[in-house]
């Protein structure tokens, strides 16, 4: 477990894996700078600005945009994280939020678990125009093994699976038991494609 940049560098030099405590989603601070500071004091080294839904001050990639990126308070959250020495994690956030955070952050940012949107067009992935900004910021995009983030074939299969579940709900009156039975039968004839380590490396 590492709590500072110096500890991360020391672990790397020793050939060890550095692990950090993270907060996955800015909803955890409930729009409170005091809560953010307390999480940092308790050992949190980074925070993902959003999770699956928007927070009042930042848009998520898997929700309908409300703030068009970061609000003024969202910018202040990024600045406070910079001041505290917490890494700003842009996985889960909308592209507009990515750009706004890169505009205001005075420290390198991370994507803790995302992939390239050019490789797999999942909304959780990072567009090329954002990736092109990382060298100047000094930030990094970290490895993810989520198959629907690295394989377009797996992503499409997930969409089809969801569409089939919707069809079954409409056709069978919406009882969850009948939907699950029909879904299991569909999966048996439409097995989930495999993703590979080569796709992770790409």
Predicted regions and their residues:
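Extended, charged catalytic domains and RNA/DNA-binding interfaces, predominantly
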Residues: 1-202
């Amino acid at each position: 477990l590492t709590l500072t940049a110096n500890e991360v560098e020391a672990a790397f030099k020793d050939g060890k894996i550095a692990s950090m405590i993270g907060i996955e989603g800015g909803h955890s601070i409930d729009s409170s700078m005091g809560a953010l500071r307390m999480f940092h004091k308790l050992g949190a080294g980074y925070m993902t600005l959003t999770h699956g839904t928007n927070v009042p001050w930042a848009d998520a990639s898997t929700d309908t945009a409300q703030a068009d990126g970061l609000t003024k308070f969202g910018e202040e959250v990024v600045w406070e994280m910079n001041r505290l020495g917490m890494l700003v994690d842009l996985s889960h956030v909308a592209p507009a939020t990515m750009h706004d955070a890169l505009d205001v952050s005075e420290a390198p940012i991370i994507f803790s678990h995302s992939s390239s949107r050019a490789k797999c067009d999942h909304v959780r992935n990072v567009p090329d125009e954002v990736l092109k900004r990382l060298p100047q910021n000094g930030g990094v995009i970290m490895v993810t093994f989520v198959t629907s983030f690295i394989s377009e074939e797996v992503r499409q299969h997930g969409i089809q699976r969801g569409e089939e579940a919707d069809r079954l709900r409409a056709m069978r009156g919406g009882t969850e038991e009948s939907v699950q039975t029909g879904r299991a039968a569909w999966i048996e004839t439409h097995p989930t494609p495999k993703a590979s380590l080569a796709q992770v490396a790409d």
